Swiss-Prot record:
Disruption of the gene: reported phenotype: Plants display cell walls with decreased crystalline cellulose, increased pectins and irregular and ectopic deposition of pectins, xyloglucans and callose.
Taxonomic lineage from the root: Eukaryota, Viridiplantae, Streptophyta, Embryophyta, Tracheophyta
Gene: PIGM
Annotated pathway: Glycolipid biosynthesis; glycosylphosphatidylinositol-anchor biosynthesis
Tissues with expression: Expressed in influorescence meristem. Present at low level in roots, hypocotyls, leaves and stems.
Protein name: GPI mannosyltransferase 1
Biological role stated in the UniProt entry: Mannosyltransferase involved in glycosylphosphatidylinositol-anchor biosynthesis. Transfers the first alpha-1,4-mannose to GlcN-acyl-PI during GPI precursor assembly.
UniProtKB keywords: Endoplasmic reticulum, Glycosyltransferase, GPI-anchor biosynthesis, Membrane, Transferase, Transmembrane, Transmembrane helix
E.C. numbers: 2.4.1.-
Transmembrane segments: 21-41, 94-114, 122-142, 149-169, 174-194, 244-264, 315-335, 346-366, 375-395, 402-422
GO molecular function: alpha-1,4-mannosyltransferase activity; glycolipid mannosyltransferase activity
Species annotation: Arabidopsis thaliana
Length: 450
């Protein structure tokens, strides 16, 4: 029997294995939701995230015809409250099931994206397991956090781009930026990748597939340089049809969602869902290195210059990453997300899920072995986080004044994040998402998706 026929025969069993993973993951999440209901009723420490209570209260207000922003600390899109209105008349755990379903959808999208790039099934399975069986990710949805919905939309946008569905990608991108502001950082790399040598009218973009060689051999310096984006080429086709269409549709959807929300909820929506996230200063302890400065000077208003300076590290790193890696789109937005969280003015644990959903998509192109280098990075990152949490526990639950050691722990956490990020970049095999149509002769050699 030929190898092709053997691979064809193996496909049903491979699909069954992946489906079994999804079924087991679903049962695990259902169990955690049911267990969470029991823990909330019988134990002092609640399983349910405090944010879920805020979401549910806002949804209840919306269901009764009032503004969800009457609920203090609700600072999200009205769409979230709308999605959770069944909490009021169906069951209070409706939202948890919705978020957990989105969590499973993320796993399915990860598998789909990797298969589209011809990653072997075994590697696909391991990559999906990094998401589905990560204790942090399978608890965040079951505890009632909405981030899995955002992750699912972002992966769907990537999948739409890979399939050449620019209209869908633009629509969902405008929607996800309205739903959660932070994906706005992906606008520039997406626009840059919509090159006329990649997206041509009437043609599906050709993907650059995974191959065995790139899993074993690190990229040379010359190869890395070829992946730096050619600025001159960009300027020549800056206003291409695809870029203009994507910008107009995504911008139109974003503005339309905001206009409808503003029509119903006015300045409350504008301030709580949008402006608040741009000017947020949190005096409570969090992972950010800025928290101590904000805590010491919270009584006074920060000047515009001080607020701008706090954004400069983020802007600088973002532009540098986009310039270097935009053609390797998935890797670029992963790096952007990690850097955005690392240098943000406020960092909470739920933000980590923003890049957890992208991590499985870059693993097949990484040369970092779990033993020892990968293990070292994991220990360093978790160790720095645990060290911070110990000081946070002393402050929060014991009432001990440990603000200075806690700030030092934040500095160490920043250093750990930076070290791990640099190692990931160094051990990554740079691979553009799309092949470029250099000429009519070379286009005949482009391997298109089956």
């Amino acid at each position: 029997m030929s190898r092709e026929s053997e691979n064809t025969d193996d496909e049903p069993s491979k699909w069954m294995k992946f489906r079994s993973l999804l079924v087991f993951s679903m049962l695990l999440r259902v169990f955690l939701i049911v267990y969470g209901e029991w823990q909330d009723a019988h134990m002092e420490v609640r399983y349910t995230d405090v944010d879920y209570i805020v979401f549910s209260d806002a949804a209840s207000l919306m269901a009764s015809g009032e503004s969800p922003y009457k609920r203090t600390t609700y600072r999200y899109s009205p769409l979230l409250a709308l999605l959770l209105t069944p909490n009021s008349f169906f069951h209070r755990s409706w939202g948890k099931f919705l978020f957990s379903a989105s969590d499973l959808l993320v796993g399915w999208f990860i598998h789909k994206i990797l298969k589209q790039r011809k990653v072997p099934e075994k590697i696909c399975t391991y990559s999906v397991m990094v998401w589905l069986f990560n204790p942090f990710t399978f608890t965040i949805g079951t505890r009632g956090n909405c981030e899995p919905i955002v992750c699912a939309m972002i992966l769907w946008i990537i999948l739409c781009l890979m399939q050449g569905n620019l209209l869908q990608a633009a629509f969902w991108y405008g929607l996800v930026v309205h739903f959660r502001v932070y994906p706005i950082i992906y606008a520039l790399p997406i626009i840059l990748v919509l090159d006329t040598q990649v997206f041509r009218s009437g043609q599906k973009p050709a993907l650059l597939y995974w191959n065995t060689g790139q899993a074993k051999t690190p990229a040379s310096n010359m190869e890395r340089k070829t992946f730096l984006f050619n600025l001159l080429t960009t300027l020549k086709s800056l206003f291409s049809r695809e870029r203009i269409m994507f910008a107009l549709i995504s911008g139109g959807v974003f503005l339309a969602c905001n206009a409808v929300s503003f029509y119903f909820y006015g300045q409350e929506f504008l301030h709580e869902a949008l402006l608040y996230h741009l000017t947020r200063t949190d005096p409570r302890h969090n992972f950010s290195i800025y928290f101590y400065h904000i805590y010491l000077h919270y009584e006074r208003q920060f000047s515009a210059v001080e607020k701008l300076i706090s954004f400069l590290p983020q802007f600088t790193v973002q532009f540098a990453l986009v310039f270097c890696f935009s053609q390797d789109l998935v890797f670029c937005i992963f790096l952007q997300t990690v850097a955005f969280v690392t240098f943000n003015k406020v960092i909470t644990a739920q933000y980590f899920v923003w890049f957890y959903c992208l991590l499985p998509l870059i693993l097949p192109w990484s040369h970092m072995k779990l033993k020892w280098e990968g293990l070292l990075c994991i220990i360093m990152w978790i160790g720095a986080q645990t060290h911070w949490l110990l000081w946070g526990y002393m402050l929060e639950f014991k009432g001990v004044n440990v603000f200075l050691p806690l700030w030092i722990a934040s500095l160490l956490f920043l250093a750990a994040n930076t070290f791990v990020l640099v190692r990931i970049i160094q051990r990554h095999r740079f691979s553009p998402l799309f092949r470029r149509y250099e000429s009519s002769s070379s286009s005949n050699n482009v391997t298109k998706e089956d």
